[in-house]
């Protein structure tokens, strides 16, 4: 139940509050026509999403300070869901890793796994990745 709860948290709540708005405003809108919702980024939406990232990062930090992985003693779909959303935000350079060492250490463990590395080789056209995105020891 905890795996499903946390996977839903990141796939629904984190996406709606953080990763979705950041990727939409900073990437998708520049490739969309005005009638499709394209145009300049909404800086208020970006600012709000960045604030929300901080709250979610603190939650991840709290979870992994009380358990080995997000949902318990072993890596699960919850870790993969959270890390996938965080990787999109990290790509854009919008994760304040210095604010939560426990969350940072957890993410470093996830992205160091061979099964996660293919995700880190994906690039967005015209948008360079942040310094921490591919660095396993950031």
Q: How should these model regions be labeled?
A:
Residues 1-6:
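Alpha-helical secondary-structure segments
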Residues 7, 11:
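Glycine-rich, aromatic-flanked loop segments that form ligand/cofactor-binding clefts
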Residues 12-111:
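GST-like fold's C-terminal all-alpha helical module
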Residues 18, 121-122:
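Short loop/turn and capping residues at structural boundaries
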Residues 36-40, 119-120, 138:
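Short, structured secondary-structure boundary patches
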């Amino acid at each position: 139940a905890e795996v499903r709860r946390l996977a839903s948290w990141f796939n629904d709540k984190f996406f709606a509050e953080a990763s979705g708005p950041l990727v939409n405003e900073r990437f998708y809108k520049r490739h969309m026509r005005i009638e499709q919702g394209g145009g300049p980024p909404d800086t208020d939406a970006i600012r709000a999403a960045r604030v929300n990232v901080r709250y979610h990062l603190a939650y991840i930090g709290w979870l992994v300070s009380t358990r080995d992985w997000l949902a318990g003693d072993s890596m699960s779909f919850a870790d993969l869901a959270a890390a996938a959303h965080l990787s999109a935000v990290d790509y854009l350079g919008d994760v304040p890793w210095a604010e939560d060492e426990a969350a940072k250490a957890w993410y470093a463990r996830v992205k160091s796994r061979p099964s996660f590395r293919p995700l880190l080789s994906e690039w967005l056209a015209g948008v360079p990745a942040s310094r921490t995105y591919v660095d396993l020891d950031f």
